[in-house]
Amino acid sequence: MRKRQFLLVAATAMGLNPAQAQQNLQADRVGLLVLHGKNPGGPRDPNIRSFALRFEREGMLVELPDMPWSSRRYIDGHWDRAMEEMDRHVATLRSRGATRIVLMGHSLGCPAALAYAVRKPDVDAAVLLAPGHIPRGYYEFANLTPVRKSIDEARAMVAAGKGDERAAFNDINQGRSLTVRLTARDYLSYFDPLSDAEMGVSAARVSASIPVLTVIGSADPLFRLAKSYVHDKLPPNPRSRYLEVTADHLTTPEVARDQVVAWMVQALARV
């Protein structure tokens, strides 16, 4: 009952017909694939875990897996492996009874959500919370040159036929320098500005039928960039929204939680 009351209030706030919203709730089972941020992120990160559990308490089906960029796995294999893992998690949600699939990414989970939506356009919506991981920015912005050097090094290794050799490469997460060991080919799958791990690349390729909510916090390092870097590259969809909240990179999911639920009611409403 609490779930229906909450979502019906949200439907009313969004100007939707409450009776129609209730009918939709009875007909649909929403499955959420929640994708955490990059190392030190992971499924136990309280900033995303409490957010995901709220949706579970509302009666939705939730998967919050340990992805290849977590603190435990950082970074485990090629970007394609991450997409394959997401495929299995979506299949799990469907096997549990989900009839609608929503991808929710935080930080690096955002480019993963976009890339998956490009490959699997049968998802119903995507939520980008504090979008992070910017291969084009890593390559072009003067303060991120250590990553550019690693991208050039990895490209040279691939060109020399050494793409499957492991090496130490640079990464930067929220201003913190990181070192990651993986093959040059796998590194480029995450960091090449032309790869689909680059949000600007994937956003433009998302099906126009998929509504996307982009949420950015006022204290996020990408606050002034997120709209033009990601959201404005999405194809037009009348249900897509861009939302600014008073939060930093880590607290954005929790701060935006109720607004995300309200948007989902609108985005998933059947016409």
Regions found by a protein language model. Give the residues of each.
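Short, surface-exposed "cap/lid" segments of acyl-processing enzymes
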Residues: A27, L32-F55, M67
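N-terminal export signals
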Residues: Q5-Q22
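Catalytic active-site module of serine/aspartate enzymes centered on a nucleophile-bearing elbow/loop
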Residues: A247-V271
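Conserved alpha/beta-hydrolase
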Residues: E56-R72
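Alpha/beta-hydrolase active-site loop
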Residues: D76-S95
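Conserved alpha/beta-hydrolase "acid-adjacent" motif
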Residues: P221-K227, T252
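Short beta-strand/loop motif that positions the catalytic acidic residue
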Residues: T214-I216
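Active-site nucleophile loop of the alpha/beta-hydrolase fold
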Residues: V127-G137
